[in-house]
Structure formats: structure tokens, C-alpha cells
Curated annotation (Swiss-Prot):
Compositionally biased residues, Basic residues: 128-139
Protein name per the record: Large ribosomal subunit protein bL17
Gene: rplQ
Membrane-crossing segments per the record: none
Biased composition (Basic and acidic residues): 140-181
A GO CC annotation given for this chain: cytosolic large ribosomal subunit
Subunit structure: Part of the 50S ribosomal subunit. Contacts protein L32.
Protein family according to the UniProt entry: Belongs to the bacterial ribosomal protein bL17 family.
Chain spans, region Disordered: 125-181
MF terms (GO), sorted A to Z: structural constituent of ribosome
PANTHER family in the cross-refs: LARGE RIBOSOMAL SUBUNIT PROTEIN BL17M, RIBOSOMAL PROTEIN L17
GO biological process: translation
Length: 181
């Protein structure tokens, strides 16, 4: 029976599993997103969320607790320096797991793990404003060019009408020349 066994051991012994999760967490903090299997992604989410919660309160004690899990000075400093200000008002749910499908070699279910506040695709609050301003500017330019293009077209039509009239007298002159001869 499986009573009281809440942790996914991921087919590894304790030291190997802890080292793997620490390395994956350091990579996630450094790159803000990583690709891995779904099982590892779920285990990583459980591993990283409490660390990010601890980094919101920058004390020596919290830094030492996070360092004991991550074992990387660079990751700890980046977590407290860059990640903490962005997630300061978020009450949890700092990571997102997106399923990607099966891996080609062994058909393992793959997932993308990312820090929520560092993704530009889903953070649409800033981008649409930029797009709208560029679109509006683009439309005004096209309207200006369209309004300037219409008089050109009208003047082009007038010149076309004038040209056939100019050609017709030449034709008549030729006919008159032939009659006179």
C-alpha cells in the first residue's frame, strides 16, 4: 500500500533527487524557463515555490535557508535581487507548467516550467498598449497617403481626358492634310 508517501521519488535516491531539483531550480532562476518532463516539472514546482516565498523577505536567515536548498550563490543572489521585486505582491503560484507533448526519442511527456512574472507572452498588459499606439500611428499615415493619393488620381484622370482630345486634332489635321493634297 502507498499510505503516507506524498513525494514523487522520480526513480532516484534521496541525494540524487535533491541535487537534481537544486540544479533544475538554479537553471529555472537563471533562465526563467526550462523544458523538462512533466513529473520533474511538478516536483520542481513543489521545490521552488517555498523558496520564492522566502525570498520576498530579504533577511540573512532566509538567504541561508534558500542557499541550503539551492547550493548556488549566484542563483540565491539573483533570486533575491531580480525575482523577489517582481513577485512581491503575488500571494503564491510563482511558476507555470505548460505541457508540450511527447518527446521524440522515448515518447516522454514534456513540459515547460517558467516563472509567471517573467513571461512576455502571457503578460499582455504592456504589449497591447504598444501595439495599439503603433497601429493608430500606422492608420493615420495610411489615411494621409490615401487623401493625398485621391487628388493625384483625379488629376491623372483629367490628364488622360485631355490627352485624347489633344490626339484627336492631330488625327483631324492629318485627314485635312490628305484632303488638301
Amino acid at each position: 500500500m502507498r499510505h503516507g508517501k506524498k513525494i514523487n521519488h522520480l526513480g532516484r535516491q534521496t541525494a540524487h533527487r535533491k541535487a537534481m531539483l537544486a540544479n533544475m531550480a538554479c537553471s529555472l532562476i537563471e533562465h526563467k524557463r526550462i523544458n523538462t518532463t512533466v513529473a520533474k516539472a511538478k516536483a520542481l514546482k513543489v521545490f521552488v515555490e517555498p523558496l520564492v516565498t522566502k525570498c520576498k523577505n530579504d533577511t540573512t536567515h532566509n538567504r541561508r535557508l534558500v542557499f541550503s536548498k539551492l547550493r548556488s550563490k549566484e542563483a540565491v543572489s539573483e533570486l533575491f535581487r531580480e525575482v523577489a521585486p517582481k513577485v512581491g505582491d503575488r500571494p503564491g503560484g510563482y511558476t507555470r507548467v505548460i505541457k508540450l507533448g511527447s518527446r521524440l526519442g522515448d515518447a516522454a511527456e514534456m513540459a515547460l516550467v517558467e516563472l509567471v512574472d517573467f513571461n512576455e507572452t502571457y503578460n499582455v498588459g504592456e504589449k497591447p498598449k504598444k501595439k495599439k499606439s503603433t497601429r493608430r500611428a500606422g492608420k493615420k499615415k495610411t489615411e494621409d497617403t490615401a487623401s493625398t493619393a485621391e487628388p493625384k488620381e483625379a488629376s491623372a484622370k483629367e490628364t488622360k481626358k485631355e490627352e485624347p482630345k489633344a490626339k484627336e486634332p492631330k488625327a483631324e489635321e492629318k485627314k485635312d492634310d490628305k484632303k488638301e493634297e
